[in-house]
Amino acid sequence: GSLHNHTQYSNLRLRDCIIKEKDLIEYAVELGHEVVAITDHEAVCNAVKVEKIYKKIKKDHPDFKVILGNEIYLCRNGLNANNFNREYDRYWHFVLLAKDAIGHKQIREISTRAWRRSYMARGMRRVPTYYQDLIDIIRANPGHVIGTTACLGGALPTQLLKYRQTKNEKRNKKIIAWCEQMEWIFGEGNFYLELQPAANAEQK
């Protein structure tokens, strides 16, 4: 299956994707996948629509699964329009996947926090999720959401790429500490590294 996918709902803040939910799900079935996840860019508002499509698909493909998720922008605690530092602040990509109804509720709560504190910066609405949000909501009741490291826009892939170039051991220790923190937040067996097949040399 494929666990990191976007639909037209990723266009809420930027032009990103033209795929419709129905087309994505039907194509996953056509390819013989057992599961497909929908992880739009800080957007969970298509959940009801996806559930309706999934119910119809499930009649003919009872073993097929659709996972509801969200690709958040993970930032340091307290980041806002007034204290953003171009030198070191980033809106790191990070994927959340709901394992059950409780997990989807947790993802919605995290998304709500991000949108409530959102702000305009450099021509785009920024929707930061703080590490503290993950601690408050997921760490408080772990086991319902899977976290993955996302693409090269994620904190871990970026740091791994820099480590590969520099072999700096301090950076390596920070990478390990970050992964340990994520496993602590999500719970054992609920934090994963994302791997994407791609021709991009940096992703190999």
Regions found by a protein language model. Name each.
Residues 1-204:
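Phosphodiester-processing cores and adjacent nucleic acid-binding clamps
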